[in-house]
């Protein structure tokens, strides 16, 4: 029965029906939690959702900075909407880790989200996650690269994580016209230390 749900979920993905695949992967995982195919499909589909939510949280922060007109070097607290977006992304990541605790891409995303949410308090937790990943898979070259990005405060952006060219807004004003920042491609994150 489970393999049928897995096959249905894969077919839904092929048709581009993400919501149906999401629901079917949950059903397959609930029916047979030890089935490796169901577990892997659940992890992959839910990881895609977690990536979307993580990107949405970053974009919500950028839009909030624009709306509140917060200056580049000014300390700020996230608005409740931004905090909720980060909480949803963290919950989605934890959901994947509940089913596949050794999924390295999900653990990388968790480290990036923890660090991105608050660089000061998130740095030690992110480094702990990444160092455990590096110990588990020393051949993965992406992990040491990410560790180096997180270990050292970025000189380019003053360790804010925001693009120094557009001040984290994703757009620059020239002759009273807003244009997408060419350095960060409108994302508002530092091109040197932006994680994931």
List the model feature ranges, each with a label:
Residues 29-30, 91-98, 132-135:
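Conserved structural position within tetratricopeptide repeats
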Residues 155-158, 167-170, 182-185, 194-196:
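Cys/His-coordinated zinc-binding microdomains
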Residues 48-95, 116-125:
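Short coil/linker segments at helix-helix boundaries
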Residues 159-162, 171-174, 189:
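Short functional micro-motifs and their immediate structural scaffolds
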Residues 7, 41, 48, 109, ...:
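"A position-specific structural signal for the A-helix of alpha-solenoid helical repeats
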């Amino acid at each position: 029965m489970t393999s049928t749900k897995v096959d249905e979920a894969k077919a839904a993905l092929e048709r581009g029906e993400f919501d149906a695949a999401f629901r079917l992967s949950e059903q397959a995982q609930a029916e047979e939690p030890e089935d490796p195919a169901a577990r892997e499909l659940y992890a992959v589909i839910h990881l895609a959702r977690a990536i979307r939510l993580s990107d949405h949280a970053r974009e919500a922060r950028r839009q909030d900075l624009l709306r509140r007109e917060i200056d580049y070097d000014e300390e700020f607290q996230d608005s409740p909407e931004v905090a909720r977006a980060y909480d949803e992304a963290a919950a989605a990541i934890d959901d994947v880790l509940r089913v596949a605790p050794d999924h390295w891409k999900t653990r990388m995303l968790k480290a990036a989200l923890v660090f991105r949410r608050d660089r000061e308090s998130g740095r030690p937790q992110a480094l702990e996650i990444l160092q455990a990943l590096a110990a588990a898979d020393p051949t993965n070259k992406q992990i040491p690269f990410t560790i180096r990005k997180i270990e050292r405060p970025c000189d380019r952006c003053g360790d804010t994580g925001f693009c120094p060219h557009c001040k984290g807004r994703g757009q620059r004003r020239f002759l009273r016209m807003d244009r997408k920042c060419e350095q960060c491609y409108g994302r508002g994150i530092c091109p040197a230390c932006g994680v994931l």
